[in-house]
Regions:
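N-terminal secretory signal peptides that target proteins for export/translocation
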Residues: 1-41
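Boundary regions of SH3-family modules and the immediately adjacent low-complexity/disordered segments
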Residues: 61-66, 112-163, 210, 214-305, ...
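Short alpha-helix capping/helix-loop boundary micro-motifs
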Residues: 82-87, 173-181
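Conserved beta-strand/loop element in small beta-rich adapter and peptidoglycan-binding domains
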Residues: 88-110, 179-240
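Hydrophilic extracytoplasmic domains
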Residues: 336, 346-414
Protein backbone atom coordinates (compact mmCIF):
# COMPACT_ATOMS: atom_id res chain seq x y z
CA UNK A 1 0.00 0.00 0.00
CA UNK A 2 1.25 3.46 -0.94
CA UNK A 3 0.16 6.73 0.78
CA UNK A 4 0.56 10.23 -0.69
CA UNK A 5 0.67 13.60 1.05
CA UNK A 6 -0.17 16.92 -0.76
CA UNK A 7 2.12 19.70 0.55
CA UNK A 8 -0.01 22.77 -0.09
CA UNK A 9 -3.26 23.85 -1.63
CA UNK A 10 -2.93 25.22 -5.12
CA UNK A 11 0.51 23.65 -5.75
CA UNK A 12 1.19 20.42 -7.46
CA UNK A 13 4.41 18.85 -6.11
CA UNK A 14 5.39 15.37 -6.93
CA UNK A 15 3.83 12.92 -4.46
CA UNK A 16 6.03 11.67 -1.60
CA UNK A 17 5.96 7.95 -1.07
CA UNK A 18 5.83 7.01 2.60
CA UNK A 19 5.12 3.31 2.30
CA UNK A 20 5.83 1.05 -0.62
CA UNK A 21 3.09 -1.19 -2.04
CA UNK A 22 1.80 -2.18 -5.46
CA UNK A 23 4.02 -0.69 -8.25
CA UNK A 24 1.12 -0.58 -10.79
CA UNK A 25 -0.94 1.63 -8.50
CA UNK A 26 2.02 3.92 -8.12
CA UNK A 27 2.49 4.29 -11.88
CA UNK A 28 -1.22 5.06 -12.41
CA UNK A 29 -1.18 7.79 -9.74
CA UNK A 30 1.97 9.38 -11.18
CA UNK A 31 0.40 9.45 -14.67
CA UNK A 32 -2.71 11.20 -13.33
CA UNK A 33 -0.54 13.80 -11.60
CA UNK A 34 1.46 14.47 -14.77
CA UNK A 35 -1.74 14.99 -16.76
CA UNK A 36 -3.06 17.32 -14.09
CA UNK A 37 0.17 19.33 -14.18
CA UNK A 38 0.05 19.59 -17.97
CA UNK A 39 -3.62 20.62 -17.94
CA UNK A 40 -3.17 23.55 -15.54
CA UNK A 41 -1.59 26.01 -18.05
CA UNK A 42 -4.36 25.30 -20.54
CA UNK A 43 -7.01 25.81 -17.88
CA UNK A 44 -5.33 29.01 -16.75
CA UNK A 45 -5.19 30.33 -20.32
CA UNK A 46 -8.88 29.54 -20.83
CA UNK A 47 -9.81 31.35 -17.64
CA UNK A 48 -7.65 34.35 -18.64
CA UNK A 49 -9.28 34.62 -22.04
CA UNK A 50 -12.74 34.39 -20.50
CA UNK A 51 -11.92 37.14 -18.01
CA UNK A 52 -10.45 39.38 -20.72
CA UNK A 53 -13.57 38.89 -22.84
CA UNK A 54 -15.79 39.94 -19.95
CA UNK A 55 -13.66 43.00 -19.28
CA UNK A 56 -13.72 44.07 -22.92
CA UNK A 57 -17.45 43.49 -23.04
CA UNK A 58 -17.86 45.73 -20.01
CA UNK A 59 -15.75 48.46 -21.61
CA UNK A 60 -17.78 48.19 -24.79
CA UNK A 61 -21.00 48.60 -22.81
CA UNK A 62 -19.68 51.71 -21.11
CA UNK A 63 -18.54 53.15 -24.43
CA UNK A 64 -21.93 52.57 -26.00
CA UNK A 65 -23.63 54.50 -23.21
CA UNK A 66 -21.58 57.60 -23.89
CA UNK A 67 -22.31 59.89 -26.82
CA UNK A 68 -21.26 63.25 -28.11
CA UNK A 69 -22.73 66.72 -27.90
CA UNK A 70 -22.17 70.21 -29.28
CA UNK A 71 -21.69 73.36 -27.22
CA UNK A 72 -24.57 75.77 -27.92
CA UNK A 73 -23.62 78.64 -25.60
CA UNK A 74 -21.24 81.32 -26.82
CA UNK A 75 -18.87 80.08 -24.13
CA UNK A 76 -19.13 77.81 -21.10
CA UNK A 77 -16.85 76.29 -18.47
CA UNK A 78 -16.06 72.65 -17.83
CA UNK A 79 -15.78 72.51 -14.04
CA UNK A 80 -14.18 70.19 -11.54
CA UNK A 81 -17.54 69.34 -9.94
CA UNK A 82 -21.16 70.49 -9.79
CA UNK A 83 -20.54 72.50 -6.63
CA UNK A 84 -20.90 76.28 -6.67
CA UNK A 85 -17.26 76.66 -5.57
CA UNK A 86 -15.89 74.20 -8.16
CA UNK A 87 -12.84 75.20 -10.18
CA UNK A 88 -13.04 76.08 -13.87
CA UNK A 89 -11.00 73.56 -15.86
CA UNK A 90 -11.55 74.57 -19.48
CA UNK A 91 -13.54 77.09 -21.51
CA UNK A 92 -15.46 75.68 -24.47
CA UNK A 93 -17.17 77.67 -27.22
CA UNK A 94 -20.21 77.33 -29.47
CA UNK A 95 -19.75 74.53 -31.98
CA UNK A 96 -17.14 72.61 -29.95
CA UNK A 97 -17.77 68.85 -29.86
CA UNK A 98 -17.44 67.01 -26.54
CA UNK A 99 -18.04 63.49 -25.25
CA UNK A 100 -20.92 63.02 -22.79
CA UNK A 101 -19.89 60.40 -20.23
CA UNK A 102 -22.57 60.66 -17.55
CA UNK A 103 -25.37 62.86 -16.22
CA UNK A 104 -26.78 63.82 -12.84
CA UNK A 105 -29.65 65.90 -11.43
CA UNK A 106 -28.75 68.22 -8.57
CA UNK A 107 -30.83 70.72 -6.56
CA UNK A 108 -30.91 74.23 -8.02
CA UNK A 109 -28.80 76.42 -5.67
CA UNK A 110 -31.26 79.30 -6.08
CA UNK A 111 -34.38 77.16 -5.61
CA UNK A 112 -34.19 73.79 -3.86
CA UNK A 113 -37.60 72.83 -5.21
CA UNK A 114 -36.08 72.68 -8.71
CA UNK A 115 -33.33 70.51 -10.11
CA UNK A 116 -30.57 71.12 -12.65
CA UNK A 117 -29.19 68.57 -15.11
CA UNK A 118 -25.40 68.37 -15.40
CA UNK A 119 -23.26 66.31 -17.78
CA UNK A 120 -19.91 64.74 -17.05
CA UNK A 121 -17.96 65.40 -20.24
CA UNK A 122 -14.61 64.95 -21.94
CA UNK A 123 -13.27 67.73 -24.14
CA UNK A 124 -11.49 67.11 -27.44
CA UNK A 125 -8.47 69.20 -26.50
CA UNK A 126 -4.92 67.84 -26.25
CA UNK A 127 -5.33 67.07 -22.54
CA UNK A 128 -8.73 65.40 -23.02
CA UNK A 129 -10.02 67.43 -20.09
CA UNK A 130 -12.81 65.78 -18.10
CA UNK A 131 -15.25 67.57 -15.83
CA UNK A 132 -18.82 68.75 -15.34
CA UNK A 133 -20.92 71.23 -17.34
CA UNK A 134 -24.55 72.36 -17.13
CA UNK A 135 -26.73 70.48 -19.60
CA UNK A 136 -28.30 73.70 -20.93
CA UNK A 137 -24.93 74.49 -22.55
CA UNK A 138 -24.86 71.24 -24.54
CA UNK A 139 -26.96 69.85 -27.37
CA UNK A 140 -26.70 66.02 -27.46
CA UNK A 141 -25.97 64.50 -30.85
CA UNK A 142 -29.37 62.78 -30.97
CA UNK A 143 -31.13 66.13 -30.67
CA UNK A 144 -28.86 67.66 -33.29
CA UNK A 145 -29.58 64.77 -35.65
CA UNK A 146 -33.33 65.40 -35.30
CA UNK A 147 -32.81 69.08 -36.14
CA UNK A 148 -30.82 68.09 -39.22
CA UNK A 149 -33.60 65.77 -40.35
CA UNK A 150 -36.06 68.65 -40.00
CA UNK A 151 -33.80 70.86 -42.12
CA UNK A 152 -33.40 68.12 -44.73
CA UNK A 153 -37.18 67.97 -45.15
CA UNK A 154 -37.28 71.72 -45.89
CA UNK A 155 -34.07 72.08 -47.90
CA UNK A 156 -36.03 72.95 -51.03
CA UNK A 157 -38.16 75.61 -49.34
CA UNK A 158 -36.89 79.18 -49.89
CA UNK A 159 -36.94 81.78 -47.13
CA UNK A 160 -40.33 83.50 -46.93
CA UNK A 161 -39.26 86.33 -44.62
CA UNK A 162 -36.59 87.24 -42.08
CA UNK A 163 -37.04 87.66 -38.36
CA UNK A 164 -35.22 88.62 -35.21
CA UNK A 165 -35.75 87.87 -31.53
CA UNK A 166 -36.66 90.85 -29.36
CA UNK A 167 -36.11 88.70 -26.26
CA UNK A 168 -34.25 85.49 -25.48
CA UNK A 169 -36.28 82.45 -26.46
CA UNK A 170 -36.11 78.69 -26.73
CA UNK A 171 -35.47 76.93 -30.02
CA UNK A 172 -37.69 73.85 -30.01
CA UNK A 173 -37.93 70.75 -32.13
CA UNK A 174 -41.74 70.99 -32.30
CA UNK A 175 -44.23 73.90 -31.95
CA UNK A 176 -45.23 72.97 -28.42
CA UNK A 177 -44.36 74.61 -25.08
CA UNK A 178 -46.44 72.37 -22.81
CA UNK A 179 -43.19 70.78 -21.58
CA UNK A 180 -39.43 71.24 -21.91
CA UNK A 181 -38.57 67.93 -23.53
CA UNK A 182 -38.42 69.44 -27.02
CA UNK A 183 -36.12 72.37 -26.17
CA UNK A 184 -32.90 72.25 -28.20
CA UNK A 185 -31.21 75.41 -26.97
CA UNK A 186 -31.69 78.98 -25.84
CA UNK A 187 -31.30 81.72 -28.46
CA UNK A 188 -30.06 85.16 -27.44
CA UNK A 189 -32.07 88.32 -27.88
CA UNK A 190 -31.24 89.85 -31.27
CA UNK A 191 -30.63 86.49 -32.98
CA UNK A 192 -31.73 86.65 -36.62
CA UNK A 193 -33.00 83.89 -38.88
CA UNK A 194 -34.90 83.01 -42.03
CA UNK A 195 -38.59 82.21 -41.66
CA UNK A 196 -39.62 79.32 -43.89
CA UNK A 197 -43.12 78.77 -42.51
CA UNK A 198 -45.44 79.16 -39.57
CA UNK A 199 -48.19 77.31 -37.80
CA UNK A 200 -50.99 78.05 -35.36
CA UNK A 201 -51.61 75.62 -32.51
CA UNK A 202 -54.13 75.63 -29.64
CA UNK A 203 -53.17 78.11 -26.95
CA UNK A 204 -52.09 76.71 -23.60
CA UNK A 205 -54.62 77.30 -20.87
CA UNK A 206 -53.42 79.94 -18.44
CA UNK A 207 -50.32 80.64 -20.54
CA UNK A 208 -48.74 84.06 -20.49
CA UNK A 209 -48.33 86.31 -23.50
CA UNK A 210 -44.60 85.46 -23.56
CA UNK A 211 -42.60 82.26 -23.65
CA UNK A 212 -43.13 80.42 -20.38
CA UNK A 213 -39.44 80.29 -19.45
CA UNK A 214 -38.55 83.87 -20.40
CA UNK A 215 -37.88 85.94 -17.29
CA UNK A 216 -37.80 89.78 -17.36
CA UNK A 217 -34.58 91.56 -16.44
CA UNK A 218 -34.11 92.29 -12.76
CA UNK A 219 -35.84 95.50 -11.72
CA UNK A 220 -37.84 95.84 -14.93
CA UNK A 221 -41.59 96.25 -14.90
CA UNK A 222 -43.84 93.71 -16.54
CA UNK A 223 -45.60 95.02 -19.61
CA UNK A 224 -49.04 96.26 -18.63
CA UNK A 225 -48.30 96.05 -14.90
CA UNK A 226 -49.36 99.64 -14.28
CA UNK A 227 -52.53 99.40 -16.33
CA UNK A 228 -55.92 98.83 -14.83
CA UNK A 229 -57.91 95.65 -15.37
CA UNK A 230 -59.09 95.12 -18.92
CA UNK A 231 -62.11 93.30 -20.24
CA UNK A 232 -61.84 90.71 -22.99
CA UNK A 233 -63.16 93.26 -25.48
CA UNK A 234 -60.44 95.78 -24.55
CA UNK A 235 -57.70 93.14 -24.66
CA UNK A 236 -57.98 91.00 -27.82
CA UNK A 237 -55.15 88.78 -26.55
CA UNK A 238 -57.46 87.37 -23.90
CA UNK A 239 -59.83 86.19 -26.62
CA UNK A 240 -57.15 84.29 -28.54
CA UNK A 241 -57.51 80.52 -28.59
CA UNK A 242 -54.42 79.89 -30.72
CA UNK A 243 -50.75 80.83 -30.67
CA UNK A 244 -48.37 81.38 -33.57
CA UNK A 245 -45.10 79.51 -34.08
CA UNK A 246 -42.44 80.21 -36.70
CA UNK A 247 -40.38 77.51 -38.37
CA UNK A 248 -36.94 79.07 -38.77
CA UNK A 249 -33.64 78.35 -40.49
CA UNK A 250 -30.53 79.49 -38.62
CA UNK A 251 -26.93 80.19 -39.53
CA UNK A 252 -24.14 78.18 -37.83
CA UNK A 253 -23.02 81.37 -36.07
CA UNK A 254 -26.31 81.45 -34.15
CA UNK A 255 -27.03 77.77 -33.64
CA UNK A 256 -25.51 74.33 -34.32
CA UNK A 257 -29.08 73.20 -35.04
CA UNK A 258 -29.93 74.33 -38.58
CA UNK A 259 -33.70 74.49 -38.06
CA UNK A 260 -36.37 74.57 -35.38
CA UNK A 261 -39.48 76.30 -34.02
CA UNK A 262 -39.73 79.62 -32.13
CA UNK A 263 -42.72 80.97 -30.23
CA UNK A 264 -44.21 83.76 -32.33
CA UNK A 265 -44.53 86.39 -29.60
CA UNK A 266 -40.76 86.56 -29.30
CA UNK A 267 -40.26 87.25 -33.02
CA UNK A 268 -40.11 90.59 -34.80
CA UNK A 269 -40.47 90.46 -38.58
CA UNK A 270 -37.61 92.37 -40.22
CA UNK A 271 -39.36 93.96 -43.20
CA UNK A 272 -36.70 95.37 -45.59
CA UNK A 273 -36.38 99.14 -45.54
CA UNK A 274 -36.94 99.20 -49.30
CA UNK A 275 -40.60 98.17 -48.90
CA UNK A 276 -41.57 98.91 -45.31
CA UNK A 277 -43.23 102.22 -46.20
CA UNK A 278 -45.57 100.61 -48.72
CA UNK A 279 -47.76 98.92 -46.17
CA UNK A 280 -51.35 100.06 -46.57
CA UNK A 281 -53.21 98.81 -43.54
CA UNK A 282 -52.23 95.17 -44.03
CA UNK A 283 -49.38 93.21 -42.53
CA UNK A 284 -46.48 92.05 -44.66
CA UNK A 285 -46.09 88.36 -43.82
CA UNK A 286 -43.73 87.21 -46.61
CA UNK A 287 -41.60 88.83 -49.30
CA UNK A 288 -39.13 87.87 -52.02
CA UNK A 289 -37.07 89.98 -54.39
CA UNK A 290 -37.74 89.53 -58.08
CA UNK A 291 -34.33 90.81 -59.17
CA UNK A 292 -31.55 88.39 -60.06
CA UNK A 293 -29.69 89.18 -56.84
CA UNK A 294 -32.59 87.95 -54.72
CA UNK A 295 -30.46 85.26 -53.10
CA UNK A 296 -28.37 87.98 -51.47
CA UNK A 297 -31.42 89.48 -49.85
CA UNK A 298 -32.95 86.35 -48.36
CA UNK A 299 -29.89 85.27 -46.44
CA UNK A 300 -29.64 85.99 -42.75
CA UNK A 301 -27.24 88.86 -42.29
CA UNK A 302 -27.54 89.73 -38.62
CA UNK A 303 -29.26 92.39 -36.57
CA UNK A 304 -29.47 94.99 -39.36
CA UNK A 305 -30.85 92.64 -42.01
CA UNK A 306 -33.86 94.91 -42.66
CA UNK A 307 -31.64 97.94 -43.26
CA UNK A 308 -29.37 96.38 -45.88
CA UNK A 309 -31.79 95.85 -48.78
CA UNK A 310 -31.19 97.78 -52.01
CA UNK A 311 -34.01 99.18 -54.16
CA UNK A 312 -35.61 96.61 -56.41
CA UNK A 313 -38.79 94.79 -57.41
CA UNK A 314 -40.63 92.59 -54.92
CA UNK A 315 -43.41 90.05 -54.51
CA UNK A 316 -45.12 90.72 -51.17
CA UNK A 317 -47.78 88.63 -49.43
CA UNK A 318 -50.16 90.61 -47.22
CA UNK A 319 -52.66 89.76 -44.52
CA UNK A 320 -55.54 91.92 -43.31
CA UNK A 321 -55.46 93.09 -39.73
CA UNK A 322 -58.39 91.94 -37.62
CA UNK A 323 -59.47 92.11 -34.00
CA UNK A 324 -61.16 88.74 -34.30
CA UNK A 325 -59.43 85.72 -32.72
CA UNK A 326 -57.24 83.74 -35.09
CA UNK A 327 -58.32 80.28 -36.24
CA UNK A 328 -56.21 77.15 -36.61
CA UNK A 329 -57.09 76.69 -40.28
CA UNK A 330 -56.94 80.31 -41.40
CA UNK A 331 -55.00 81.14 -44.59
CA UNK A 332 -51.43 82.45 -44.44
CA UNK A 333 -52.25 85.60 -46.45
CA UNK A 334 -55.15 87.19 -48.32
CA UNK A 335 -53.55 89.43 -50.98
CA UNK A 336 -50.59 89.52 -53.37
CA UNK A 337 -48.78 92.79 -53.90
CA UNK A 338 -46.12 93.10 -56.62
CA UNK A 339 -43.94 96.19 -56.37
CA UNK A 340 -41.96 97.21 -59.45
CA UNK A 341 -38.92 99.49 -59.54
CA UNK A 342 -37.91 101.95 -62.23
CA UNK A 343 -34.13 102.29 -62.16
CA UNK A 344 -34.06 105.43 -64.33
CA UNK A 345 -36.42 107.38 -62.09
CA UNK A 346 -35.42 105.43 -58.98
CA UNK A 347 -39.06 105.02 -58.02
CA UNK A 348 -41.30 102.12 -57.04
CA UNK A 349 -44.72 101.53 -58.58
CA UNK A 350 -47.55 99.04 -58.14
CA UNK A 351 -47.20 96.35 -60.80
CA UNK A 352 -49.98 94.14 -59.47
CA UNK A 353 -52.42 93.90 -56.58
CA UNK A 354 -54.62 90.82 -56.41
CA UNK A 355 -58.21 90.62 -55.25
CA UNK A 356 -58.76 89.05 -51.83
CA UNK A 357 -57.78 85.38 -51.83
CA UNK A 358 -57.16 82.55 -49.39
CA UNK A 359 -53.46 81.98 -49.96
CA UNK A 360 -50.94 79.57 -48.48
CA UNK A 361 -47.16 79.31 -48.42
CA UNK A 362 -44.60 78.70 -49.73
CA UNK A 363 -43.87 81.52 -52.15
CA UNK A 364 -41.46 80.44 -54.89
CA UNK A 365 -39.81 82.48 -57.65
CA UNK A 366 -38.45 80.74 -60.74
CA UNK A 367 -36.69 81.80 -63.92
CA UNK A 368 -34.04 84.36 -64.77
CA UNK A 369 -33.93 87.86 -66.20
CA UNK A 370 -37.28 89.13 -67.45
CA UNK A 371 -38.68 85.61 -67.90
CA UNK A 372 -39.81 84.84 -64.37
CA UNK A 373 -42.77 83.34 -62.57
CA UNK A 374 -43.82 83.09 -58.96
CA UNK A 375 -46.09 80.48 -57.43
CA UNK A 376 -48.19 80.14 -54.29
CA UNK A 377 -51.11 77.95 -53.21
CA UNK A 378 -54.73 79.13 -53.27
CA UNK A 379 -57.98 77.68 -51.95
CA UNK A 380 -60.53 77.57 -54.77
CA UNK A 381 -64.33 77.85 -54.61
CA UNK A 382 -64.66 74.14 -53.88
CA UNK A 383 -62.36 74.43 -50.87
CA UNK A 384 -59.48 72.61 -52.54
CA UNK A 385 -55.96 74.05 -52.19
CA UNK A 386 -54.14 74.12 -55.54
CA UNK A 387 -50.92 75.56 -56.95
CA UNK A 388 -51.19 78.91 -58.72
CA UNK A 389 -48.47 80.31 -60.99
CA UNK A 390 -48.17 83.99 -61.96
CA UNK A 391 -46.05 85.22 -64.88
CA UNK A 392 -44.01 88.42 -64.86
CA UNK A 393 -43.48 90.41 -68.05
CA UNK A 394 -42.91 93.98 -69.26
CA UNK A 395 -45.26 95.90 -71.52
CA UNK A 396 -44.35 98.10 -74.49
CA UNK A 397 -43.21 100.87 -72.16
CA UNK A 398 -41.00 98.55 -70.15
CA UNK A 399 -43.30 98.56 -67.14
CA UNK A 400 -43.50 95.32 -65.16
CA UNK A 401 -46.85 93.56 -65.33
CA UNK A 402 -48.25 90.34 -63.89
CA UNK A 403 -50.39 87.74 -65.66
CA UNK A 404 -52.52 85.83 -63.16
CA UNK A 405 -53.26 82.12 -63.73
CA UNK A 406 -55.35 81.75 -66.88
CA UNK A 407 -54.52 85.22 -68.21
CA UNK A 408 -52.54 85.86 -71.38
CA UNK A 409 -49.35 87.87 -71.16
CA UNK A 410 -49.23 91.27 -72.80
CA UNK A 411 -46.60 92.16 -75.35
CA UNK A 412 -43.08 92.17 -73.93
CA UNK A 413 -40.46 94.76 -74.59
CA UNK A 414 -37.72 93.38 -76.81
Amino acid sequence: MTLFVRRGRGSHPKPTRLLTGNSDSQRIMEFRNRMRDRGSPALFATQFLLLATLLLSGCSTLASRSNTGVVVSRSAQIRSSTAVVAADLLEVNRGDVIDILDSIDIPDPSDNSKRELWYRVRAHNDDRTEGWIEARNIMPDKVLENARKLAEEDKGTPAQATGQLHAGSNLRLTPDRSNNENIMMRLDSGSSFEIIGWKRVPKLKGSDSTESDTAPKAGSATAGANKGPQSDEDNPEEQETTELWYKVRLSPQNSPAPEGWIFGKQVELMVPSDIIYYRTGREFVAWRRIDDDSNDETSTKGKDVAKESRPGSWVILERSSSKEPHQLDEPDFDRIYVLGYEKHDQEHYTAYRSPDIEGYLPLRIEGRGSDKTFSIRIKDDSGKITDAKYSLYRDDRGVMRVAAPGEVKGKRRR
